């Protein structure tokens, strides 16, 4: 499989901005068009660095909204391997243990790879691997309310810990790294993951790249 046979789409934006929703929508609709074995989704979160050598007290102090928390080098390597026609083993990250598990998820080469993550557009090397990129431009207050509900319900977090993390790292890192990366996006999507027009534009772009 040559690189031109694999289209990589990056979907970035603040935490809880609608990235996963639009990625899921694109995935499901392209699966109907191309087949389920031709589309893959990679979450940037899977590439948080392994912290198994640290105590839990040390792990919770990590700034997970800083680019250094992520192993983008491994992600870039995996994208290049997929483009070359090789399968890759993607790490599995535990939000409750704040480190990688011993498990891996094998991903085989696909026609379309959808990346989604908060810091994708901050890395020049990652941007070079993308054929098109999207930034979810959702107001921060809406993102915060969604994140609060999600992290308490799904990730074993307390309300106080989510609020503290937001004020100490999430919001400052968004302003320092994530929002400035919007300039590198090909498509800026307002109103979250349910923006049907933006979804159709992105699908059309993918189909054009595959033609």
UniProtKB/Swiss-Prot annotation:
It comes from Shewanella pealeana (strain ATCC 700345 / ANG-SQ1). The gene is udk. It is found in: Cytoplasm. This is Uridine kinase. The lineage of its organism: Bacteria, Pseudomonadati, Pseudomonadota, Gammaproteobacteria, Alteromonadales. ATP binds at residues 13-20. It catalyses: uridine + ATP = UMP + ADP + H(+); cytidine + ATP = CMP + ADP + H(+). It is an enzyme of class 2 (transferase). Pfam families: PRK. Its main location: cytoplasm. GO terms for molecular function: ATP binding; cytidine kinase activity; uridine kinase activity. One of its GO terms (biological process) is UMP salvage. Belongs to the uridine kinase family. The keyword Calcium does not apply. Its EC number is 2.7.1.48. Keywords: ATP-binding, Cytoplasm, Kinase, Nucleotide-binding, Transferase. One of its GO terms (cellular component) is cytoplasm. Pathway: Pyrimidine metabolism; CTP biosynthesis via salvage pathway; CTP from cytidine: step 1/3; Pyrimidine metabolism; UMP biosynthesis via salvage pathway; UMP from uridine: step 1/1.
